[in-house]
Amino acid sequence: MHHYVIIDAFASAPLEGNPVTVFFDADDLSATQMQRIAREMNLSETTFVLKPRNCGDALIRIFTPVNELPFAGHPLLGTAIALGAHTDNHRLFLETQMGTIAFELERQNGSVVAASMDQPIPTWTALGRDVELLKALGISDSTFPIEIYHNGPRHVFVGLPSIAALSALHPDHRALSSFHDMAINCFAGAGRRWRSRMFSPAYGVVEDAATGSAAGPLAIHLARHGQIEFGQQIEILQGVEIGRPSLMFARAEGRADQLTRVEVSGNGVTFGRGTIVL
């Protein structure tokens, strides 16, 4: 038998945010079994906690219903919050395929209510398929250069002129499915408050409630293009249009040619617990 918890990540109340199933003590499971379990759970991601291979507190493997991911934001934040219930430590180091990710845990009345992570520093380049992407999104232009960031997942960013325009998006998901191995992040806002929507048929996600791995790159994107200062924390609200409001905080420190830290944080709550017989 294997025990699991479901954490609603980037949420302050159950049934908000982005859910992740976290399986503990998964060392006896094969990669094939993990993939089949993730398909059975049918959430956007499921994580498996294994004994560390290096100097971390645990090794984490992340699966969507269709493939394994080297890194993902909301699954790792949810996993850190789940593991925090089993330790008094205020810091956790979780090993992933993209390296060891450091977490700071925030507690209230003894319970972990939030976590912050140091994300991998991404690389970026122009997408080069702007016209095709804009047509798939049903819009004529982007308010920012369309660029793709890579920090494990690959995230494309498209700017919208207003929150209303962002909410009105109705993408052609069949056309978006031709953008292989990438997620399309559309955003709007100003100052420190931004809204986002993420579409990724290529990753098996029609629309994501909270894309933590895109939050850090969005902060970089905004700073690189003069909308915020490097080191300034922003709020990113996502999932509103699908009834799963999710609040993320992100900050990129350094400068465009020498980033020193990418931090993403948010709350999380336990939604449920269970056991599988396997």
Curated annotation (Swiss-Prot):
Name of one Pfam family that matches: PhzC-PhzF
Catalysed transformations (reactions): (5S,6S)-6-amino-5-hydroxycyclohexa-1,3-diene-1-carboxyate = (1R,6S)-6-amino-5-oxocyclohex-2-ene-1-carboxylate
EC number(s) on file: 5.3.3.17
Keywords, comma-separated and alphabetical: Antibiotic biosynthesis, Isomerase, Virulence
Catalytic residue positions: 45
UniProt enzyme class: isomerase
Pathway(s) where this gene product acts: Antibiotic biosynthesis; phenazine biosynthesis
Molecular functions (GO terms): trans-2,3-dihydro-3-hydroxy-anthranilate isomerase activity
Entry GO terms, CC: cytoplasm
GO biological process: phenazine biosynthetic process
Protein task: Isomerase that catalyzes the condensation of two molecules of trans-2,3-dihydro-3-hydroxyanthranilic acid (DHHA) into the phenazine ring system. The final product is not yet known.
Matches recorded under NCBIfam families: PhzF_family
Record family assignment: Belongs to the PhzF family.
Official protein name in the record: Trans-2,3-dihydro-3-hydroxyanthranilate isomerase
Origin species: Pseudomonas chlororaphis
